[in-house]
Amino acid sequence: MEGVTTDAWTQAQVELHGRLTLSELADLFETSAPKIDAIIHNFPQPIISQFVMDAVTHEQDMRSALGVPGGRDSKAVEVGVGFFLNLIEVSDPPLFNELTSTSVSQWDILRSLTGRRTVKQMNALGLDGEAIALHFPGSPFSLPKEAVE
């Protein structure tokens, strides 16, 4: 999966699957699931947590696009935030302390850490948007220029 998360990789996926109907996409996912199921129990930490973070992030993207909220207090959201906290604890202890002591919901923290909140939105939540923004360069995430949700 060379180039995964790059714009070129994303565009290649759109070109490959963009003409499929929702039913055809569901069938494709259905045939792929057993392959993942057969190996997922062997995924080590932190890869498995990253896998969960990615899945729940895209689930929430779809929910937002469809206007169907839900799953905001799920174990998957907790695991996704935990994935980031493990990284931030080492790289930025003050931000780690802020994120683990705030009253901001885990869902809003996840959406902030995955590029679904502007700095202004993060600040309005009571988070240090500028400090969070410093973690985006070199990651697969980028800050939106305009409010996403």
Language model: regions and residue ranges:
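Hydrophobic/aromatic-rich structural module bridging two neighboring secondary-structure elements via a short loop
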Residues: 1-39
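Structured surface interface patches that mediate subunit assembly and partner/cofactor docking
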Residues: 2-6, 31, 38-149
